[in-house]
Amino acid sequence: MSEKEQKEVEAKESSGKAEERRETREKQVRGDVGIAWIYASYNNTIIHITDLSGAETIAFASGGMVAKADRDKPSPWAAMQAAARAAKIALDKGIRVVHVKIKAPGGYGPKTPGPGAGPAIRALVRAGLMVDRIEDVTPLPTDSIRKPGGRRGRRV
């Protein structure tokens, strides 16, 4: 065979492998899929895994469930432990793929997630869950919201 014919054969083989990979990935994604809701504030981190509709709770864990002291609840360590606990329960119940939705307090509170958001996602992946997409669902005010305390602030 000439070099040109050999390259054509290799191209056909490689495209077939790519199609196979696509098909196997689609099969994996179509399996049991859930949503991992991560609420990360500066006081705590809550991981809540539900089915795709969001109506049925599959697993739940928070930083307060694994931390011994209140000051440790929002820490990255507590978030990782809580995410690993929730992921283990979800894997036992048959969830393999999760869509991650991160939420910060929002509104008139902070719009950025707390320190446990990133480590929680990392722990979900390490526990064996496949993360399909990551989305930020922090509630943002569309005007008409005012900080508590009024115009002159909180008088102590």
From Swiss-Prot:
GO annotations of cellular component type: ribonucleoprotein complex; ribosome
Region span, Disordered: 1-27
Domain of life: Archaea
Keywords for this protein: Ribonucleoprotein, Ribosomal protein, RNA-binding, rRNA-binding
Example of a GO biological process term: translation
Annotated Pfam families: Ribosomal_S11
SUPFAM superfamilies tied to this protein: Translational machinery components
Role summary: Located on the platform of the 30S subunit.
NCBIfam families: PRK09607.1
Protein name: Small ribosomal subunit protein uS11
Lineage start: Archaea, Thermoproteota, Thermoprotei, Thermofilales, Thermofilaceae
